[in-house]
């Protein structure tokens, strides 16, 4: 089973990202679940959302404490939240930032990867909403989910131009994190 923890701020779409990742996993023929972890937080407060993906039914119902993968939607969270907490040594942490991975100095043995998802979102979607963009980066970095499945899940959730722009941004982030585009 693969476990993913998404760090964001209230209103950034962390829960939607976890749900779309779960739907994409289902599209790939896998079992999945997605759920948030927040209380009475307001817009802008740190939140977490989780996705589990497995080839067999998932019976576990607890929060994710030792993720294989971590997605950080807002790099300012690195100052206040230990995003690397519990991540497996062979895991991957994907951070939305203009910085290079080495400059982040995260206390982890996991591989740290960065992508400027905000720029991709602004250039293609026209708004700084990075949740879907980072799912493309996740697909490219991990190979756990087909990028086409993520695009299909997004198009099913957001119709018309919004869905298409998001699908294009997903493809761009997928290529960026794999080093296929500059």
Curated annotation (Swiss-Prot):
Keyword vocabulary terms for this entry: Oxidoreductase
This enzyme's EC code(s): 1.2.7.1
GO MF term set: pyruvate synthase activity
Record field: catalytic activity: 2 oxidized [2Fe-2S]-[ferredoxin] + pyruvate + CoA = 2 reduced [2Fe-2S]-[ferredoxin] + acetyl-CoA + CO2 + H(+)
Family matches, as Pfam families: POR
PANTHER family from the UniProt entry: PYRUVATE SYNTHASE SUBUNIT PORC
Subunit structure: Heterotetramer of one alpha, one beta, one delta and one gamma chain.
Note: It also catalyzes the oxidation of 2-oxobutyrate.
Protein name: Pyruvate synthase subunit PorC
Source organism of this protein record: Methanosarcina barkeri (strain Fusaro / DSM 804)
């Amino acid at each position: 089973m693969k476990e993913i923890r998404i760090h964001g701020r209230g209103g950034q779409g962390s829960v939607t990202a976890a749900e779309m990742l779960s739907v994409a996993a289902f599209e790939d023929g896998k079992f999945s679940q997605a759920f948030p972890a927040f209380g009475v937080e307001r817009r802008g407060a740190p939140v977490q959302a989780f996705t589990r993906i497995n080839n067999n039914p998932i019976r576990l119902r607890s929060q994710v404490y030792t993720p294989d993968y971590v997605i950080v939607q807002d790099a300012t969270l690195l100052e206040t939240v230990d995003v690397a907490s519990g991540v497996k040594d062979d895991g991957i942490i994907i951070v939305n930032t203009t910085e290079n991975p080495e400059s982040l100095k995260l206390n982890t043995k996991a591989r740290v990867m960065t992508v400027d998802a905000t720029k991709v979102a602004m250039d293609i979607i026209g708004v700084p909403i990075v949740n879907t963009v980072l799912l493309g980066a996740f697909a490219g970095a991990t190979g756990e989910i087909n990028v086409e499945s993520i695009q299909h899940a997004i198009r099913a959730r957001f119709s018309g131009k919004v869905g298409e722009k998001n699908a294009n941004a997903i493809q761009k982030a997928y290529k960026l994190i794999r080093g296929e585009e500059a």
